Design a protein with these regions (language model features):
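Short, well-formed alpha-helical segments that are part of the catalytic scaffolds
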Residues: 5-21, 25
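Acidic helix N-cap motif at the loop->helix transition within catalytic regions
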Residues: 11, 35-44, 92
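A conserved acidic beta->alpha catalytic loop
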Residues: 16, 29-41, 58-59, 84-85
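Conserved donor nucleotide-binding strand/loop of the catalytic core
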Residues: 39-72
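Catalytic-site signature of metal-activated, phosphate-bearing donor transferases
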Residues: 63-70, 87-215, 225
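"A position-specific structural signal for the A-helix of alpha-solenoid helical repeats
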Residues: 199, 236, 271-274, 278, ...
């Protein structure tokens, strides 16, 4: 772990970690705190009887400083767990009884609802085989030609938090975009240009600079490469165009282009059905909602909106089914949605109301 000025949350973070993962040793690098973060860390682990060490390293960039922490830890345990101060385990995380793989991916989500689920490397062998790359949105690279990898599934998420010290900076996303854009145009890390373009777009989006985000998502899509990033870039262009009140025809073409690029993903069709319904194109909405519902949960790992596959596409289909006169389908879907544990409670009154409306026609 690397930390800076996390005194407000670090104890809760550490409590959360040890409640889910047994720790034998800790290594944490402080990158320039001017509060008592390091003291809180030491006091916490002393109370728990867990040995370890805290280092103080000058800040350079994320990959550099994570590598510093990794070098401090090398050889002191069999595996290392990587964790950010504002991340949290939610649910029932079960560590495999026997650790045999070189690298482990854990389920990440941006909220407890499970929307935008993806997998990230959070644990790997502590034998010098792995290192970090990237000035921002850094990732784990391997030195060995082949490694054994494993995804840890289960009823849990690691929630990627936004309440640490860095997130309190109102200019965070704009500044991140500037750093990533500079890295994109730098002659270094030529093989990371597609990644830098993608996260430049993400950062401009999160800074609410939608036109710039669209420009960079388009740049990322045109670079080709990893199909999941290309698909997500195409989808985001369409969704940002919706935010900018682009004409329906333009939005429809963009969402269909995303679907055509990756037809095993349902998100683009769900959003298309919703936009068509909102523009009173009910018959078309019904067709595309039907198509979205027919797509099973994807095996993709990047920013998958599980809620679309679990209930949102069915919700959209139920509404359009009612308006095209397929009252039985609307009725059946509403019953299913009412008993679907993935549906947030605040939506169920609407499903019950829709169910009653459909019943009147049966």
């Amino acid at each position: 772990m690397i930390v800076k000025n996390e005194s407000a949350i670090i104890r809760d973070t550490l409590e959360n970690i040890i409640a889910h993962v047994p720790l034998d040793y800790y290594v944490i690098s402080d990158t320039g705190s001017d509060d008592n973060t390091a003291d809180i860390i030491k006091q916490f682990f002393d109370e728990k009887g867990i040995p370890g060490e805290i280092h103080h390293d000058e800040w350079v960039n994320f990959a550099h400083n994570r590598n510093c922490a990794l070098q401090h830890a090398q050889g002191k345990t069999d595996y290392v767990l990587i964790f950010d101060a504002d991340d949290r385990f939610e649910g029932n995380f079960v560590l495999p009884e026997e650790l045999t793989s070189d690298r482990y991916y854990l389920r990440m989500a941006n909220s407890v609802t499970g929307a935008n689920v993806y997998f990230r490397t959070l644990m790997f062998r502590n034998d010098g085989s792995f290192y970090w790359r990237g000035v921002l949105h850094e990732f784990v690279e391997q030195r060995k030609k082949t490694v054994v990898e494993q995804k840890i599934f289960g009823d849990y998420y690691v929630i990627s938090g936004r309440f640490g010290a860095r997130s309190k900076n109102p200019q965070k996303y704009f500044q991140d975009a500037q750093v990533l854009e500079k890295a994109f145009y730098s002659p270094e890390d030529e093989d990371l240009k597609d990644r830098y373009a993608f996260y430049t777009a993400q950062s401009y989006r999160d800074a609410d600079m939608y036109e710039k985000a669209i420009e960079w998502y388009a740049k990322r899509a045109n670079l080709g490469g990893w199909y999941e990033e290309v698909y997500y870039s195409l989808l985001q262009i369409a969704l940002l165009k919706i935010e900018l009140n682009a004409p329906l025809d333009e939005v429809q073409n963009l969402l269909l282009a995303a679907y055509e690029y990756r037809p095993q993903r349902a998100e683009s069709l769900y959003h298309l059905a919703r936009q068509l319904r909102l523009h009173d194109k009910i018959k078309l909405a019904y067709i595309y909602a039907n198509a979205a519902v027919s797509i099973p949960l994807t095996k993709d790992i990047l920013f998958v909106d599980h809620s679309v596959y679990e209930w949102k596409a069915k919700d959209e289909l139920a509404v359009s089914a009612y308006w095209v006169g397929n009252y039985q389908l609307c009725h059946d879907l509403c019953v299913e949605l009412l008993f679907n544990p993935a549906v947030p409670e605040q939506n169920k009154k609407r499903f019950l109301d829709n169910l009653m409306l459909a019943k009147k026609h049966l």
